[in-house]
Amino acid sequence: MSDLFAKLMDQIEMPLDMRRSSAFSSADIIEVKVHSVSRLWEFHFAFAAVLPIATYRELHDRLIRTFEAADIKVTFDIQAAQVDYSDDLLQAYYQEAFEHAPCNSASFKSSFSKLKVTYEDDKLIIAAPGFVNNDHFRNNHLPNLVKQLEAFGFGTLTIDMVSDQEMTEHLTKNFVSSRQALVKKAVQDNLEAQKSLEAMMPPVEEATPAPKFDYKERAAKRQAGFEKATITPMIEIETEENRIVFEGMVFDVERKTTRTGRHIINFKMTDYTSSFALQKWAKDDEELRKFDMIAKGVWLRVQGNIETNPFTKSLTMNVQQVKEIVHHERKDLMPEGQKRVELHAHTNMSTMDALLTVESLIDTAAKWGHKAVAITDHANVQSFPHGYHRARKAGIKAIFGLEANIVEDKVPISYDPVDMDLHEATYVVFDVETTGLSAMNNDLIQIAASKMFKGNIVEQFDEFIDPGHPLSAFTTELTGITDKHLQGAKPLVTVLKAFQDFCKDSILVAHNASFDVGFMNANYERHDLPKITQPVIDTLEFARNLYPEYKRHGLGPLTKRFQVSLDHHHMANYDAEATGRLLFIFLKDAREKHGIKNLLQLNTDLVAEDSYKKARIKHATIYVQNQVGLKNMFKLVSLSNIKYFEGVPRIPRTVLDAHREGLLLGTACSDGEVFDAVLTKGIDAAVDLAKYYDFIEIMPPAIYQPLVVRELIKDQAGIEQVIRDLIEVGKRAKKPVLATGNVHYLEPEEEIYREIIVRSLGQGAMINRTIGRGEGAQPAPLPKAHFRTTNEMLDEFAFLGKDLAYQVVVENTQDFADRIEEVEVVKGDLYTPYIDKAEETVAELTYQKAFEIYGNPLPDIIDLRIEKELTSILGNGFAVIYLASQMLVNRSNERGYLVGSRGSVGSSFVATMIGITEVNPMPPHYVCPSCQHSEFITDGSVGSGYDLPNKACPKCGTPYQKDGQDIPFETFLGFDGDKVPDIDLNFSGDDQPSAHLDVRDIFGAEYAFRAGTVGTVAEKTAYGFVKGYERDYGKFYRDAEVDRLAAGAAGVKRTTGQHPGGIVVIPNYMDVYDFTPVQYPADDVTASWQTTHFNFHDIDENVLKLDILGHDDPTMIRKLQDLSGIDPITIPADDPGVMALFSGTEVLGVTPEQIGTPTGMLGIPEFGTNFVRGMVNETHPTTFAELLQLSGLSHGTDVWLGNAQDLIKEGIATLKTVIGCRDDIMVYLMHAGLEPKMAFTIMERVRKGLWLKISEEERNGYIDAMRENNVPDWYIESCGKIKYMFPKAHAAAYVLMALRVAYFKVHHPIMYYCAYFSIRAKAFELKTMSGGLDAVKARMEDITIKRKNNEATNVENDLFTTLEIVNEMLERGFKFGKLDLYKSDAIEFQIKGDTLIPPFIALEGLGENVAKQIVKARQEGEFLSKMELRKRGGASSTLVEKMDEMGILGNMPEDNQLSLFDDFF
């Protein structure tokens, strides 16, 4: 027996008689694996033989009990030198295996633990009855059983199962006989009951029919059993089992209907021990109705069988019974008026840290009867808008705050400096070693110092101090100091006095002096000794300011850089001497480089203006007290993100002081300076700091628990003492003390979500900094930070006594809430910028263009429409929005680009007249370009003016122009015309940056900001976090649990960004802080634009937001115009050749078989996708109006599939008559006879998917009105299926652009293909594209096969789209040339007759910068070698090799020397 093993046996008090057995003779511990995060220890033992079963059980039980006392889980396995396979020992251990997880599941244990085992032919044989599922045993249980028996010491085992015929017959016989006995008894009981009943009944003439089986009674009994059944925790289910009952919450639901019409609901539940997948089939309508109770958030009791799902291969419950149950939520049980106010709560806008939404925080506080609740996210206020709206709705006061990162503006190098010559001074360079970082809870164990003059050590001080208790392993490992060093050490007070004498008349010096000085002063104070008053130099800050270019300024890195000896880092005497040597290097450099000679100069002349970047961050909570404070808060957030950002947003103290009006300050958490001072400097220092604040925060002891693990506080009693000290600080500083919860999630069981999110940050994050070193290092546990009720908080602080606890938890928090005024976070009105004479300009431009097109006087229909729109636009202050959009479009037009409109702006005729959109929303009409005569078709018989037959003006004979899409103005600004206009514009991607700068130019840079966005953790990303957490922390979750955890961890703020085209314009008579703070996107301080801090959607009804989006269509049109010289405005919308594309391929000169599709839609915007091409094939559109229908149908949700598609297939409706775009509903219903207001309301309900969500009474009212006006039932039913609809104006703008592109495909094909490949194609494979039709078709077939097998990559999918167009181009007789080193462009394809020459960027792996460099280099001279191409052209060796393989380089030699050699010989 080894000494180590013997010591372990002593610790667990293993009985001596068992230790003396022969198996223990050579016992040893082979290895111990310590899993620090899970606190699991794995022992691997060696024994001479397999232990007797009684000895094994004793060893097992004593190990478990002993380590449980230290909160450590233990497992162990055994390697036995000799193995005894005797039947008795085998049978005993076989049965023992079923007492250990995972073999101890109820079903496995009951079925297999009693079976007989023997050892034959080097195999363990299990005899089982023949009806046992051997396959199930082998697949699901055998591996676990083998593993457990091997852990007992039986070595590598082979196990087999045989059928025991005798057992089978015996069990079968017993089963049959017992069943017969039961049946016989049931029959006998029934006969006796019948006889008794007959004796009681009067005689009857007719025979009574035989009693029927009472199914209802059976169901009732089953239900009663279900109600009383034992609930099984989900975590315990590991194998297939029957009649299991769960209780839990539904978190995912999916309904399906099979092809045969059967209904199934798949759902997932959690009981917070684990989660499970469940499914239920509906056998009849009653079962189907039960599906309605299975919804997200509902708590259910379910019973069913656990089976392995053949598709997912995971355990799934097939539900037999289900019942909704009441889940008892936590409640705040304190009486009204005696409830606390939570003043420190983080929402999911605290980056990668908190889980609860601001809505759930406010709703819960309101539900609990709290009068107010505060929001204090980390360094941001992005939850303010939602919190503001939710609080108003919930009838509770929201207190708006944040937890800020406060730093000192300038961190001094010297404390208490005096006028002294640095080079004539005497220095005491000292260092202390301690048992931890807390001066109040940890002890000094060494003080060492070197007294130095002019760089020489003149005297040294080195004393150990016995703390009165053994040192922890961590302290010994860190410092190298052991208990032996401390034996015989002097008392602390003696050492302190001696050190004070040693330091007289000297400047004190330390590395990170704030710690050492703070520790010394706390100990001086504790022993009534004077604190340090002489000057102190901090060499850490000295180095940071003197050598800002260095990344690390710790003692270790600095001594290495300056070659100063440091043999035993973290022993005070060595550290002190090394610090002293560094000091004189610093003094010399400071004198020579900066002229620093006097101690006073260190702070005045050397401390950098941006030293705040390196300053230690301290947390503080800042609260908005009134409206002035809100604006100051916005300014502080902005400054911290824009001017003072360094790793995190920082607020220098002087900046906070300058903006403190209307704000209240709290001391925050354990990272606040007051809490830190209590720990490290003492109560007196903490009181001085506390005077800066408005109140002192204390938190539940559970929140401070990680400080115990980090050895900053000794134990629970130490935490309670710190809280008492904080209360004492408040008393002395005359500041109220408030108990806050530091909330990060709502419910206790949600702790795991935060754990997953925080641990995903990795060890680089401060919150994950490890405790200990090596394999045993682990991050500190996270505190229990759920939202606590008043009762729970009072329980947390019960150690203070009832009265004091009530004061800090309830009274003081309520008093603070009463000091907070209601503020307006989000404005109630729209504030547009001011443009001089905007109203007059919009009206003037509108009438000017209208007169030009329609004549003066205007037709009544035009005049009335303009008057209606201008009344709304000018009356609601929207003119500036229209004018700004017009100015931007006009500027882009002047640069040669068309601008496409998006959304519903095309519903506004004023927008059309002033040039914002090309879409004309008037009813279809003719208008003469010569005499302005017009004809309008207002009966709804024509869907689009472009579909009117060509016609000449009856007055002057000039061919009419055709226009009008029949779109009501109400779809843009609402029925009353007061909805804030959202004008979205598609600029060319090439011109988008210029358009953005136009906004700055028009409104001023200080008023234009990019629209900010907040990026949150997506569920797929959260899934990855969960899997990573499993891997890193030794967890295993079943699939349903992974899904739950991923859903729970999703939605947390991860980063910020900017809308791709959104720009917010602040009115020039206000400033941005009236609406939102500002910041840089994704904390990129080099970004050229600042963004709104708030998500732009939160303020889009208060300020002007311009959507200046980049789009390929305008770029494509510009390219085609440049190639052809054709003005796209002149392209007709009813070109016959273009319309022919939608019905066949003949117009392209190819057959459908050649290009693989029956129409010519490939590469046409809006219509080129597989989905829309399929729609075209089914509907065969022939008019512009029908194309609008297709556009609407393809962009809507539940508009085509399962709706219009079926109506058209069944001949009930046509493409023309189905509901396609949202506006069609209003127009159709008005033509049918409904009042405009009702028609508008119906349209709004349908387009937003609300038709089935409104009250039945409201919906029936609409249906009755429609039926009264002969609206067909199919139309009404179609309305009920729609979830989302596309605006007709948007469709019209897109279709118009698409037809212009299609025009070039038909009439100028080589130009079309050149533009397509230059602008739209996403992937290229030049070798294939230049290889001819066979190569292209073969590659397409290859990708098609991969697609069928789900093996195609995203790049291959993009390439397939490109190859479809290449194939079409080649089939039409055009050619695809090879890349040419001297002719190819960098970026764009070029036309050479009937051939396209690809650009360099089309070569896989060659980027835009290299492409441009090659073109530039070739202009400077021919490439004489591959080496020169690499050097001057910037091409990598791989790219040059690829070019060579493709024949692009010809016979180019490897280097120039070979060329010279060839020239001479």
From Swiss-Prot:
EC number: 2.7.7.7
Alphabetized UniProt keyword annotations: Cytoplasm, DNA replication, DNA-directed DNA polymerase, Exonuclease, Hydrolase, Nuclease, Nucleotidyltransferase, Transferase
GO MF assignments: 3'-5' exonuclease activity; DNA binding; DNA-directed DNA polymerase activity
UniProt subcellular location: Cytoplasm
Primary location class: cytoplasm
Enzymatic reactions: DNA(n) + a 2'-deoxyribonucleoside 5'-triphosphate = DNA(n+1) + diphosphate
Pfam family, one: DNA_pol3_a_NI
Source organism superkingdom: Bacteria
One example of a Gene Ontology biological process annotation: DNA-templated DNA replication
Domain named Exonuclease: residues: 427-583
GO CC terms in record: cytoplasm
Record family assignment: Belongs to the DNA polymerase type-C family. PolC subfamily.
Function: Required for replicative DNA synthesis. This DNA polymerase also exhibits 3' to 5' exonuclease activity.
Protein name per the record: DNA polymerase III polC-type
Taxonomic placement: Bacteria, Bacillati, Bacillota, Bacilli, Lactobacillales
